């Protein structure tokens, strides 16, 4: 069994008030919460810094935890919730991003089960990249793994770099590119240790907080997601796309 915590920071530079953005009649954070509840999690908690978000979650029958506004990352917000609820060190926590209203419940379950069985401090997921534009897009985080499925590195750069192919053209890519999905599973004790580590140089360069884990010698297990998640919402255009996706599904989530 596992617990899902959904960080729902209210302030957003590109999309202010994002957690409460309406998607087919419900706030986005409620859409994410409903997907998480379908994963089989024993508990789903929304961690936010805004009372309006708390009210929206509770009105929808969910559980919300009010957290500080000064956290620098979703992981720090999770750590506050873990301390408030006094979760045991071995409790499996799945961090589901609050801007993923179309996240498949199956992959939430998948990442929790992978953590339970892989022997790493942290587990996450990835999906194949088939489009060269995505491979060269710095907003699409790439990951490379070793033979046992443990992450070697995450980067905004195109990794691995196909020297011979890319010397000729950037229009086609091979079949070995993976895009990291921002879903994480870890035990509560691991998060308690993580927040005591100083940010690493690589993390600061790439602006990817998971690189802190590799920097300090911990392992991250990466598996291919059982399902490809729908659009995440980071901009107004993303929000329009998410609304269209829900309309196309023609069902209430």
Swiss-Prot record:
Say which species the protein is native to. Answer: Proteus mirabilis (strain HI4320)
Q: GO BP, one example?
A: CMP-keto-3-deoxy-D-manno-octulosonic acid biosynthetic process
- Transferase among keywords: yes
Answer yes or no on keyword Transferase: yes
Question: Which Enzyme Commission number(s) are listed?
Answer: 2.7.7.38
Q: Which gene encodes it?
A: kdsB
State where it is primarily located.
Answer: cytoplasm
- Keywords in alphabetical order: Cytoplasm, Lipopolysaccharide biosynthesis, Nucleotidyltransferase, Transferase
One family name in Pfam for this protein: CTP_transf_3
What does it do? Activates KDO (a required 8-carbon sugar) for incorporation into bacterial lipopolysaccharide in Gram-negative bacteria.
As its record notes, the protein acts as a catalyst of: 3-deoxy-alpha-D-manno-oct-2-ulosonate + CTP = CMP-3-deoxy-beta-D-manno-octulosonate + diphosphate
NCBIfam families linked: kdsB (TIGR00466), PRK05450.1-3 (NF003950), PRK05450.1-5 (NF003952), PRK13368.1 (NF009905)
The pathway that the record names for this protein is: Nucleotide-sugar biosynthesis; CMP-3-deoxy-D-manno-octulosonate biosynthesis; CMP-3-deoxy-D-manno-octulosonate from 3-deoxy-D-manno-octulosonate and CTP: step 1/1; Bacterial outer membrane biogenesis; lipopolysaccharide biosynthesis
Give GO terms: molecular function aspect only.
Answer: 3-deoxy-manno-octulosonate cytidylyltransferase activity
Q: In which domain of life is the source organism classified?
A: Bacteria
**Localization (cell):** Cytoplasm
Give the record's GO CC terms.
cytosol
Tell me what this protein is called: 3-deoxy-manno-octulosonate cytidylyltransferase
Which family would the database say this protein is a member of?
A: Belongs to the KdsB family.
């Amino acid at each position: 069994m596992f617990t899902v915590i959904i960080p729902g920071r209210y302030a957003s530079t590109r999309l202010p008030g994002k957690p409460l953005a309406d998607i087919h009649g419900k706030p986005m954070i409620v859409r994410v919460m409903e997907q998480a509840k379908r994963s089989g999690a024993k508990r789903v908690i929304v961690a936010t810094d805004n009372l309006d978000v708390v009210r929206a979650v509770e009105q929808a029958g969910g559980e919300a935890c009010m957290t500080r506004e000064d956290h620098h990352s979703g992981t720090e917000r999770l750590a506050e919730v873990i301390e408030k609820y006094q979760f045991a060190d071995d409790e499996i926590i799945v961090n589901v991003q609050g801007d993923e209203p179309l996240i498949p419940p199956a992959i939430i379950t998948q990442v929790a089960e992978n953590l339970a069985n892989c022997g790493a401090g942290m587990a996450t997921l990835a999906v194949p990249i088939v489009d060269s534009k995505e491979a060269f897009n710095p907003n699409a985080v790439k990951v490379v793994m070793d033979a046992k499925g443990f992450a070697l590195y995450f980067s905004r750069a195109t990794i691995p770099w196909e020297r011979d192919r890319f010397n000729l053209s950037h229009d086609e890519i091979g079949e070995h590119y993976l895009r990291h999905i921002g879903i994480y599973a870890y035990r509560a004790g691991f998060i308690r240790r993580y927040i005591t580590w100083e940010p690493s140089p690589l993390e600061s360069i790439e602006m990817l907080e998971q690189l802190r884990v590799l920097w300090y010698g911990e392992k991250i297990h990466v598996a291919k997601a059982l399902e490809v998640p729908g659009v995440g919402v980071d901009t107004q255009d993303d929000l329009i796309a998410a609304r269209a996706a829900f309309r196309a599904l023609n069902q209430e989530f």
